[in-house]
Structure formats: C-alpha cells, structure tokens
Amino acid sequence: MIRNFLNFLWNNTSLRFLIINTIIFAMDKVRCAHLLLKHTGSRNPVNRNTGMAVTRTKEEAVSEMKGYLEMLRKSDNLDQEFRRLATAKSECSSARKGGDLGFFDRNTMQKPFTEASFKLEVNEISDLVETDSGVHLIYRIA
C-alpha cells in the first residue's frame, strides 16, 4: 500500500516536481536571526532603526557583543531571549522582526556570515562573526 502511494507520488509529474523542489529548498537554505552592532569602520555606520551615526569603535562593538553572547549562552530560553535582545539592540532593520532574516541561500549574505550560518545547528548561536557590516551574533532558526 505504501509502495503504491509512493509510486503514485513519483509518477505524478507535478507532485514529483514539488517533492524535489521542496527537498532542494530545505537542503540549500537556512533561516537565521541576527544581532548586528555596527562600528565606525563598518560599511555603513548608521543605525538602521534610529538613523543616527554609529560612534563606537570596532573594539567597543566586540566587547559589547561578547557581553550579549555570554548572557545568551546562560539563557534558559535562547529563542525568546535572542529575539528580545535583537529587537532591543540590533542596528539592522531586521530588529523589528526580532532579528529574523528569513530563509536565505549560500549566495545571499556576505561570506563570513554565510559560512557561520550554515555551520550552525538549528537552535544554536554563533560566536562573534565580523563582516563589512559590523559584528554579528547569528541564531539559526531552521
């Protein structure tokens, strides 16, 4: 009976296309949230949420982010705490969505961000990741 059902699915061209694309989509994309702190050396040192120029140094951004990372690693509810912190502190427009960037593939983000994101397991947080945009903490959602 299961074999007949699987044969039906495979022999139906539309369903086969849907199944294959679903598998490819799931394998080649991740969904992450992030917390971004910019610094004076960032590509665009302006807080996307306030419109204010960022005045912190890279060293200050790293130090501040290390504090957030330590706090998150001690959290009993990483998902909730990460989203709360990203909403309050991130300097990316994604802060309005708890830092959620949605699904993205290997060609969407800057290379260090992509590499860190695809190495993470679901519900895992990265170490500090530096890109031209600033210093990030990345949380893999899916």
Curated annotation (Swiss-Prot):
Q: Which InterPro entries match?
A: PPIase_dom_sf, PPIase_Pin1, PPIase_PpiC
How is this protein activated or inhibited?
A: Directly inhibited by buparvaquone and juglone anti-parasite drugs. Inhibited at lesser degree by the non-quinone inhibitor dipentamethylene thiuram monosulphide (DTM).
Instruction: Give one Pfam family.
Output: Rotamase
Q: Which PANTHER family does the UniProt record give?
A: PEPTIDYL-PROLYL CIS-TRANS ISOMERASE, PEPTIDYL-PROLYL CIS-TRANS ISOMERASE-RELATED
Task: Provide the assembly information.
Answer: Interacts with host FBXW7; leading to FBXW7 autoubiquitination and subsequent degradation.
Q: State the compartments where it is located.
A: Secreted; Host cytoplasm; Host nucleus
Q: Which reaction does it catalyse?
A: [protein]-peptidylproline (omega=180) = [protein]-peptidylproline (omega=0)
Write the protein's name: Peptidyl-prolyl cis-trans isomerase NIMA-interacting 1
Q: Which UniProt keywords apply?
A: Host cytoplasm, Host nucleus, Isomerase, Oncogene, Rotamase, Secreted, Signal, Virulence
